[in-house]
């Protein structure tokens, strides 16, 4: 018996096609011209925990070993170079750009473990090796203590032609129909921001807005209490469709939990009664309440060693992880680094006037200061490349970065106007009307509101790569160095003199 049944197969429509992003290797032609660039010795000095101000004026900046250093490298415009080879490129049909081939970030100063802490740190009880049951975490006393430790060990080197993107947890907007109370836990959300020079990195206390979400100012070290600690958003930068924010990166993070303790304060989300059996009140205890479950650790980065250094070594860029294979659009490079393995804090001590002529004295006769210093040097190997000014390339570049076309001084000529306009001859005389004010020049820099360490290499390029350390490494690695062959010496020719025979008579 035949029975008709409706089909059970499901039909799936093909997904909509996505816009294809071409790789820079498809429209950027590389030449055999290379340049070497190097910065000066870059130094910075400041207080390791906070900046010192006097009446709104900053006297000493904050220079912490746990801060990001973001260098904005400005390169010269290769289209303004005077090349001896006229066949290198056609300025009517092509434009020149820089491509990054090698980089080396050198760090000075000796290795040293940085120390961070807080003189009023929220440490209540030792829960690692407890000797007594403390359940008075919510009383009226102040249990804060002065505590210091070494942070998580972080080394990071990241570079691209746009700034790196960071992520952190911040307070979210609260719902208007159900407003929370002041003591309720605020909603939080993950936000993305640009990593700027001087931002704090994550050192074991989470990537979050500590200033907004921790009102006690005692949950983290001093350098984080009024700051935002950011973590690079590797997931988002790896999915960047143009691949400009991260050509490649090298990182090393290391941490272990050194000590375990609990925090004091009211426990609004205490342990539910069904999760434990009610305890018996012991002698000397004010109540039989359960202790707080607000646990915390003190991080430690452990040993610093020269065997595990990310810096002071050369990196060669053969193939970037994104679609941008090292092309430095707008003639700039952003280098983002973190290195707290050279986090030694210098202690400076001066004598008071009463102690200058004495050999012994009390501590009140001395004044102490804290400073942290950092030393950098950046080296680059750049390759000269060219882009054809085809309509397809210009359309794509304009949709990606409109400033590229503007910097190349490519514009469409305006159509002639059909109206008659007035043009006065003597604009500066009192006989004619005042000339209209010139509009202020608009700052077209898209990063004018961000803070970076500006490094200008416009006059620090050289094509003599064999005269510099990184250049010689590149020549040896790439096989571009001319190897001279010694011409073999001619074989010696032996001349045998024949002896003349005397003629017999």
Swiss-Prot record:
Its main location: virion. Transmembrane segments: none annotated. One of its GO terms (biological process) is endocytosis involved in viral entry into host cell. It is found in: Virion; Host nucleus. SUPFAM superfamilies: Group I dsDNA viruses. It comes from the Viruses. One of its GO terms (cellular component) is T=7 icosahedral viral capsid. Keywords: Capsid protein, Disulfide bond, Host nucleus, Host-virus interaction, Late protein, T=7 icosahedral capsid protein, Viral attachment to host cell, Viral penetration into host cytoplasm, Virion, Virus endocytosis by host, Virus entry into host cell. One of its GO terms (molecular function) is structural molecule activity. Residues 479-505 are annotated as: Disordered. Belongs to the papillomaviridae L1 protein family. Self-assembles into homopentamers. The capsid has an icosahedral symmetry and consists of 72 capsomers, with each capsomer being a pentamer of L1. Interacts with the minor capsid protein L2; this interaction is necessary for viral genome encapsidation. Interacts with protein E2; this interaction enhances E2-dependent replication and transcription activation. Forms an icosahedral capsid with a T=7 symmetry and a 50 nm diameter. The capsid is composed of 72 pentamers linked to each other by disulfide bonds and associated with L2 proteins. Binds to heparan sulfate proteoglycans on cell surface of basal layer keratinocytes to provide initial virion attachment. This binding mediates a conformational change in the virus capsid that facilitates efficient infection. The virion enters the host cell via endocytosis. During virus trafficking, L1 protein dissociates from the viral DNA and the genomic DNA is released to the host nucleus. This is Major capsid protein L1. It comes from Cottontail rabbit papillomavirus (strain Kansas).
């Amino acid at each position: 018996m035949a029975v008709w049944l409706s089909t059970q197969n499901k039909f799936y429509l093909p997904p909509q096609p996505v816009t294809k992003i071409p790789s820079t290797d498809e429209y950027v032609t590389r030449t055999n011209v290379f340049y070497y660039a190097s910065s000066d010795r870059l130094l910075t000095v400041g207080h390791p925990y906070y900046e010192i101000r006097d009446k709104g004026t900053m006297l000493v900046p904050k220079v912490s070993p746990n801060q990001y250093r973001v260098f904005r490298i400005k390169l010269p415009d290769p289209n303004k170079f005077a090349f001896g080879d006229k066949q290198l490129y056609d300025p009517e049909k092509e434009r020149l750009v820089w491509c990054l081939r090698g980089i080396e970030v050198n760090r000075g100063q000796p290795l040293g473990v940085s120390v961070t802490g807080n003189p009023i740190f929220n440490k209540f009880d030792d829960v690692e090796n407890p000797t007594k049951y403390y359940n008075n975490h919510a009383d009226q006393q102040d249990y804060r203590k002065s505590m210091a430790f070494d942070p998580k060990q972080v080394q990071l080197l990241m570079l691209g032609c746009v700034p790196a993107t960071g992520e952190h947890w911040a307070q979210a907007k609260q719902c208007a129909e159900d407003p929370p109370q002041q003591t309720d836990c605020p909603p939080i959300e993950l936000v993305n921001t640009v990593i700027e020079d001087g931002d704090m990195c994550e050192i074991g206390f989470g990537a979050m807005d500590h200033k907004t979400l921790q009102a006690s100012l005692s949950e983290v070290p001093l350098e984080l209490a009024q700051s935002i600690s950011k973590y690079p958003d590797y997931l988002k930068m790896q999915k960047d469709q143009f691949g400009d924010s991260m050509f490649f990166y090298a990182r090393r993070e290391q941490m272990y939990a050194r000590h375990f303790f609990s925090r004091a304060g009211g426990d609004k989300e205490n342990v539910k009664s069904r999760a434990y059996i009610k305890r018996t009140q012991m002698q000397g205890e004010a109540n039989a309440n359960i202790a707080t479950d607000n646990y915390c650790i003190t991080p430690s980065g452990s040993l610093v060693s020269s065997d595990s250094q990310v810096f002071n070594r050369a990196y060669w860029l053969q193939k970037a992880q994104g679609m941008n294979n090292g092309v430095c659009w707008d003639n700039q490079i952003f280098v983002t680094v973190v290195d707290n393995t050279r986090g030694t804090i210098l202690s400076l001590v001066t004598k008071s006037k009463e102690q200058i002529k004495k050999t012994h004295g009390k501590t009140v006769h001395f004044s102490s200061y804290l400073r942290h210093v950092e030393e950098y040097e950046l080296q680059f190997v750049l390759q000269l490349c060219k882009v054809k000014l085809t309509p397809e390339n210009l359309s794509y570049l304009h949709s990606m970065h409109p400033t590229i076309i503007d910097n190349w001084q490519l514009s469409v000529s305006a159509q002639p106007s059909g109206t008659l306009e007035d043009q006065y001859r003597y604009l500066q005389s009192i006989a004619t009307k005042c000339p209209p004010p010139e509009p202020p020049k608009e700052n077209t820099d898209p990063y004018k509101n961000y803070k970076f360490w500006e490094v200008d290499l416009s006059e620090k390029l050289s094509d003599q790569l064999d005269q510099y350390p990184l250049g010689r490494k590149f020549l040896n690695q790439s096989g571009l160095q001319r190897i001279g062959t010694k011409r073999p010496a001619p074989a010696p020719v032996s001349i045998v003199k024949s002896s003349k025979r005397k003629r017999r008579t």
